[in-house]
Curated annotation (Swiss-Prot):
Keywords: NAD, NADP, Nucleotide-binding, Oxidoreductase. One of its GO terms (molecular function) is nucleotide binding. It catalyses: benzaldehyde + NAD(+) + H2O = benzoate + NADH + 2 H(+); benzaldehyde + NADP(+) + H2O = benzoate + NADPH + 2 H(+). PROSITE patterns: ALDEHYDE_DEHYDR_CYS. The active site is at E215, C249. Its EC number is 1.2.1.28, 1.2.1.7. NAD or NADP-dependent benzaldehyde dehydrogenase that catalyzes the conversion of benzaldehyde into benzoate in the (R)-mandelate degradation pathway. NADP(+) binds at residues 117-119, 143-147, 175-178, 193-194, 215-216, 249, 337-339. Pathway: Aromatic compound metabolism; (R)-mandelate degradation; benzoate from (R)-mandelate: step 4/4. This is NAD(P)-dependent benzaldehyde dehydrogenase. Gene3D superfamilies: Aldehyde Dehydrogenase, Chain A, domain 1 (3.40.605.10), Aldehyde Dehydrogenase, Chain A, domain 2 (3.40.309.10).
Length: 436
């Protein structure tokens, strides 16, 4: 994979600045045509994406169709259907102090944008922000993850087929290339990744007063109440925790269950894991050998009891689906976002305790999941735990709705996107007053 020199990166950045200045990207018809070209290029490279995602992350086709390609195509179709509505100026009243006048709000493009893609859903979480940049009327430079090289190469091919580089371009690379890109005066930056790198991005953006969106992560709790449907809960855990080998920013990071139903729940869960995820690579591949080693070290240090799993093969980047009971808040497994197929289990004795302990130890997660039949209690919990998003009796699928904003709060991120929210994120609200 060829990396560009700093001089060539600077040249590309300047070319995008010049192209944006022509205002070609502001034309609504141009934006729609760009979405159509992106859609066509993704479809034409579907088989290549299947192969690349299988190699990089061990993703089966059904997961790719749902959470990678399908998610992108659905987002494109939604934007095409609604863009005319979104770009229309919004008229507002003129108070007496500024009358007579006509007042309205328009959304203007930022300019040259920079999207830093992650490794875990490298197609969806790179191209969906790009859709926002396009519908906002911007140009865009994309740096996909260097840890998923096969998929990043296909993304570069898709972009090259769909767009001229002065409009949208991919720059491959690692830390050095990203550091140089972050030194440039972009008009907007969209980052998906870890909180530690997010801080670096924000510090770099501050030097140019560049607005940012940070899509980060955190330890998302799945809280199980005494009246929960245990079979439903296990179904959602099997999907949410172990898809993509646990490498999902909104995956349930830990299970926080009322003591009265813990044993019954774990009996069901462990049996399902043994039956449906019996192999060491049943959940897919971890992104690097280093990630396997990190998770193995945490398992070796835990004071909890492994109920199932914990088999690892570093060379295959594989770790079996693992459930660990008897975990306390100070356990190594609770020290950081796991981002792997390990489910620590903690128990609580009252709703008040559950709320207080989550807020104390891992506040403001990207998502909170509550399972129970009493909606007043369940809604009370999600109303008292600050989080990016929340669900009752379900996990993760809120991220597939273009009608819902997706984003974090505090350490789990800032800003949001999807659907109309992507358009709002990638544009500036401009107030206009016209005096007759």
């Amino acid at each position: 994979m060829n990396y560009l020199s700093p001089a060539k990166i600077d040249s590309l950045f300047s070319a995008q600045k010049a192209y944006f200045a022509t205002r070609a990207t502001a034309d609504v018809g141009f934006r729609k045509q760009s979405l159509e070209r992106l859609k066509e290029a993704v479809i034409n490279n579907k088989e290549a994406l299947y192969s690349a995602l299988a190699e990089d992350l061990g993703k089966p086709k059904d997961v790719v169709d749902l959470a990678e390609i399908g998610a992108v195509l659905h987002e494109i179709d939604f934007a095409l259907a609604h863009l005319d509505e979104w770009v229309a100026p919004v008229s507002v009243p003129s108070p007496d102090i500024i009358a007579p006048s006509e007042c309205y709000v328009v959304q203007e493009p930022y300019g040259v944008t920079y999207i830093i893609g992650p490794f875990n859903y490298p197609v969806n979480l790179t191209l969906t922000p790009l859709i926002g940049a396009i519908i906002g009327g911007n140009t865009c430079i994309i740096k996909p993850s260097e840890t998923t090289p096969e998929t990043s190469a296909v993304i570069e091919k898709i972009i090259a087929e769909a767009f001229a580089p002065e409009y949208v371009a991919v720059i491959q690379g690692g830390r050095d290339e990203n550091s140089h890109l972050l030194s440039l005066p972009f008009d907007f930056i969209f980052f998906t990744g870890s909180p530690n790198v997010g801080k670096v991005v924000m510090q770099a953006a501050a030097k140019h007063l560049t607005p940012v969106v940070l899509e980060l992560g955190g330890k998302c709790p799945l809280i199980v109440l005494p009246d929960a449907d245990l079979d439903q809960t296990v179904n959602q855990l099997m999907f949410g925790k172990f898809i993509n080998s646990g490498q999902t920013c909104i995956a349930p990071d830990y299970l926080y269950v009322h003591y009265s139903v813990k044993d019954a729940l774990l009996e069901r869960l462990v049996e399902r894991v043994k039956t449906e995820l019996p192999e060491i690579n049943s959940t897919g591949k971890l992104v690097t050998e280093r990630q396997v080693q990190r998770l193995v070290s945490l398992l070796e240090a835990t004071q909890g009891q492994v109920l199932v799993g914990s088999q690892a093969d570093v060379s295959k980047r594989a770790l079996s689906a693992t459930v660990v009971d008897g975990v306390e808040w100070n356990d190594p497994l609770m020290s950081e976002e796991l981002f792997g197929p390990i489910l620590p289990v903690l128990e609580f004795d009252s709703v008040r305790t559950a709320i207080d302990q989550v807020n104390k130890h891992h506040p403001k997660p990207l998502a909170v999941y509550v399972f129970g039949k009493d909606m007043d209690v369940a809604k009370g919990i999600i109303n008292q735990i600050q989080s990016g998003d929340a669900q009752v009796n379900g996990v993760m699928l809120h991220a597939f709705s273009p009608y819902l904003p997706f984003g974090g709060i505090g350490a789990s991120g800032m800003g949001e996107y999807h659907g109309h929210f992507s358009y709002l994120t990638f544009t500036h609200k401009k107030s206009v007053r016209i005096v007759p």
